[in-house]
Amino acid sequence: MPIKAVIFDLDGTITRPYFDFDAIREQMGLPRDSGPVLESMLKMAPAQRRRAERILHHHEREAVERSELNPGARQTLSALRRMGLRIGVLTRNTRANAVAIARKHDLRFDAIVDREDGPVKPDSFGVLHLCRQFGVEPGQTLLVGDYLFDLLCAKAAGAVAVLLSNNDRANEFAAHADFCIENISEILQIVEQSNRGSTV
């Protein structure tokens, strides 16, 4: 089945890894082993959650201001567009921050799904939503990310899971990936090989 769309995680995939989630948990008063921040916040009392949201928003805004693209990101996005593929972003961040990063780095995405649109990764919602918007099947879609939730999300939706190995935990996640890459530009080779001989 030909690849017709590529969905990217944002933080750590399009941009270089920045967030120190242990520091964020500490500021929120959470144990280091408390699990993902967003899920932990849902369990908080209202006043504690509001404080945690302010802390998270501060770190997210700082991440936008200091964001740098991963090597090859802009060139890869441009090449995918020339190949006629649809390009989406699926992030646990906010739409405002995703748009701010796109503007800062002069990037163009066909669609963005953020944490305010529905259930977040690893739920399959975002992938399925983008596939419907693009008019493609999940099996015609790559999901590229640097964390376990990206891969589980892809698998749950029936998309092709691609792990960008850019952190010291990548080996823990590799078993859940269909492809493992070290540079985002390797996506182009995956698309070309997948589409070679495929009928549209």
PLM features per residue range, with description:
Residues 1-4, 79-82, 99-200:
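Asp-based, Mg2+/Mn2+-dependent phosphohydrolase catalytic module
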Residues 1-50:
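Active-site neighborhood of HAD-like aspartate-dependent phosphohydrolases
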Residues 13, 20, 95, 149, ...:
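Conserved Rossmann-like nucleotide-cofactor binding loop
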Residues 16, 89-90, 145, 165:
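Small/polar loops that bind or transfer phosphate-bearing groups
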Residues 19-20, 72, 149, 186:
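Residue-level recognition of oxygen-bearing side chains
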Residues 24-25, 57-60, 98:
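Hydrophobic alpha-helical core bundles mediating ligand binding, dimerization, or RNAP-core interactions
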Residues 49-60, 107-112:
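Short, basic/glycine-rich phosphate-binding loops at helix/coil junctions
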Residues 62-89, 95-103, 124:
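Short, acidic loop-to-helix structural element flanking the phosphoryl-transfer center
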